[in-house]
Curated annotation (Swiss-Prot):
Keywords, alphabetical: Ribonucleoprotein, Ribosomal protein
Cited PANTHER family: LARGE RIBOSOMAL SUBUNIT PROTEIN BL19M, RIBOSOMAL PROTEIN L19
Protein known as: Large ribosomal subunit protein bL19
Organism: Synechococcus sp. (strain JA-2-3B'a(2-13)) (Cyanobacteria bacterium Yellowstone B-Prime)
Cellular component GO terms, alphabetical: cytosolic large ribosomal subunit
Gene3D superfamilies: 2.30.30.790
Family listed: Belongs to the bacterial ribosomal protein bL19 family.
HAMAP family reported for this sequence: Ribosomal_bL19
Cited InterPro entries: Ribosomal_bL19 (IPR001857), Ribosomal_bL19_CS (IPR018257), Ribosomal_bL19_sf (IPR038657), Translation_prot_SH3-like_sf (IPR008991)
Gene: rplS
Length: 125
């Protein structure tokens, strides 16, 4: 039993070293801009992906967010591992006021029906 506890502590300490400390507080419904490092040819650049957080899964180092945007009339969703070294930055542009943990119903909506009310607070808080 004691060996199991030590193994869990070792795993927790390794994960803590890998986690990013400077991430903003992200909630479902927020409008975010995620900077992703991508490699094209021999060059590396940061590509911005801006959209609404429709789901959050897992915790700790395995935390993921699903971000959805509509591009040229087609819905695009990407799942980001927020503590990944490929993620350069995450900015919260606007806080959304929602009453659900998962916003998958937005997939069925079109145009203005996909809008989410803004929270009264500022995005920095």
């Amino acid at each position: 039993m004691n060996v199991r506890i030590n193994a869990e502590e070792i795993i927790r300490s390794i994960e803590a070293a890998q986690m990013k400390p400077d991430l903003p507080e992200i909630r479902v419904g927020d409008q975010v801009r995620v900077g992703v490092r991508i490699q094209e040819g021999g060059k590396e650049r940061v590509q911005a992906f801006e959209g609404t957080v429709i789901a959050m899964r897992h915790s700790g180092i395995n935390r993921t967010i699903t971000v959805r945007k509509v591009f040229q009339g087609i819905g695009v969703e990407r799942v980001f591992l927020i503590h990944s070294p490929r993620i350069e930055s995450i900015q919260v542009l606007r806080r959304g006021k929602v009453r659900r943990a998962k916003l998958f119903y937005l997939r069925d909506r079109v145009g203005k029906a996909t809008r989410i009310k803004a929270k009264a607070e500022s995005p920095d808080s």
